Amino acid sequence: MRTAIIAGNWKMNKTVKEAVELVKELKPLVKDAKCDVVVCPTYVCLPAVLEEVKGSNIKVGAQNMHFEESGAYTGEISPKMLEELGVHYVIIGHSERRQYFNETDETVNKKVKKAFEHNLIPIVCCGESLEQREGNVTEKVLEGQIKVDLKELSKEQVEKLVIAYEPIWAIGTGKTATDEQANETIGYIRTVVKSMYGEDVASKVRIQYGGSVKPGTIKAQMAKEEIDGALVGGASLKAEDFSAIVNF
């Protein structure tokens, strides 16, 4: 049985003070959660948020990282730095990174490998555009992404990582994939993992849905057999909304 995982991606929101206030408010609301709870603040908020979640069931993730340990990469953060801080998870290959920062599947794969070297659990994002969905090439696109994103990993690593299926057309648009669409597509992603690493590994990989997840949509989504959680954007910025999702 896979343990559900709900992660909040705060994106470029919340000052340090606001981040601490949000986590303070969140802690009592999610203390009895039956799923893994993760918050992913901005880099500058990580130390304060890590301090605030001590003793609670909330884990902390970063929103990105570089694949090198150090070097002349102005503005970047290395996995070594995240590991030293005590970060547990790291989002890799979010559609906004792919869209605005030209991140490729090859880059994603380098980051995934490096994350494991530093005891970080990657939340690997994949998804198709509206054009690709309407052109009936969703499966082809996702297979292409997964086969590169997850190449040359050990079975143990693949079992540990989290995949987030986020249809790009449903991010921040208010549009969502139907529960059936999400379940079917996540099931397909699992078959791609199976073709690479076998049935046993594929059955253990946790695959989230991401794309305008709200308190009103989560229950039906989580009732689907293939969906193991959610990567939540805007709704993770309010303790009331995020806790309602976590306590689905």
UniProtKB/Swiss-Prot annotation:
Q: Name one Pfam family in it.
A: TIM
Reported EC number(s) for this entry are 5.3.1.1
Q: In which pathway does it act?
A: Carbohydrate biosynthesis; gluconeogenesis; Carbohydrate degradation; glycolysis; D-glyceraldehyde 3-phosphate from glycerone phosphate: step 1/1
Q: Which keywords appear in this protein's UniProt record, sorted alphabetically?
A: Cytoplasm, Gluconeogenesis, Glycolysis, Isomerase
Indicate where this protein resides in the cell: Cytoplasm
Q: Please give the chief subcellular localization of this protein.
A: cytoplasm
User: What CDD domains does the record tag this protein with?
Assistant: TIM
Q: Which residues form the active site?
A: 94 (electrophile), 166 (proton acceptor)
Protein residues bound to substrate: 9-11, 172, 212, 233-234
Annotated S-S bridges: none
User: Is Isomerase included in the keywords of this UniProt record?
Assistant: yes
One biological process term in Gene Ontology:
glycolytic process
InterPro entries (UniProt xref): Aldolase_TIM (IPR013785), TIM_sf (IPR035990), TrioseP_Isoase_bac/euk (IPR022896), Triosephosphate_isomerase (IPR000652), Triosephosphate_isomerase_AS (IPR020861)
The catalysed reaction is:
D-glyceraldehyde 3-phosphate = dihydroxyacetone phosphate
Q: Name one GO cellular component term.
A: cytosol
Identify a single GO molecular function assigned to this protein: triose-phosphate isomerase activity
What is known about its subunit structure?
Homodimer.
Role noted for this protein:
Involved in the gluconeogenesis. Catalyzes stereospecifically the conversion of dihydroxyacetone phosphate (DHAP) to D-glyceraldehyde-3-phosphate (G3P).
The family note in this entry says: Belongs to the triosephosphate isomerase family.
| Protein's UniProt name | Triosephosphate isomerase
Per the UniProt record, the source organism is Clostridium botulinum (strain Loch Maree / Type A3)
Task: Name the encoding gene, please.
Answer: tpiA
